[in-house]
Amino acid sequence: LCPCYAFRFFSFINFINFSIMNFPIISSLILLPTIGALFIFFTRSSSKYQSSKYVALFISLANFLLSLYLWYIFDKSIVDFQFVENREWLSGFINYKVGIDGISILFILLTTFIVPICIISVNATVTNKLKNFLIAILLMETMMIGVFCSLDLVVFYLFFEAGLIPMFLIIGIWGGE
């Protein structure tokens, strides 16, 4: 193998890392489960809901891989927040500001690791309204990642309070089974 191929490969990796800096990767990490939940909501329900389970599993695994990539490109020598996205919201009073630091990346990895395990183990625990359960799980994943990434107090509060709704539904409907 010629060393020039190794150089090309590493320059390709550096190109990916350089081009990802302008991409809103944290917003993608937050919105991907919501898009999956909307897709499951608008699909026709089959008799066994297996297609919904596979879609939810695919979305959650894609989110886990995205968080692994985020952990890979995370610079552990920087103490400050990284991948910060700041959008003005509500006439400058409230900003949609998200970013990650060393602790929040670990919580994001934990969240995106546990959700596919929950979706895989859903056959043994959930017997009714599986489609609604999967939508609630994906929405709760969105809200938890939003809580761990938020840098604005109002955005944190909105993600935290919105995360209580699917959690309440999961505990209330499927908690006694």
Question: Can you name each region flagged by the protein language model?
Answer:
Residues 30-33, 56-59, 111, 137, ...:
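Residue-level recognition of transmembrane alpha-helices
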Residues 35-37, 115, 139-144:
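Hydrophobic, membrane-inserted alpha-helices
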Residues 47-49, 139, 143-177:
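Alpha-helical multi-pass transmembrane bundles of energy-transducing inner-membrane proteins
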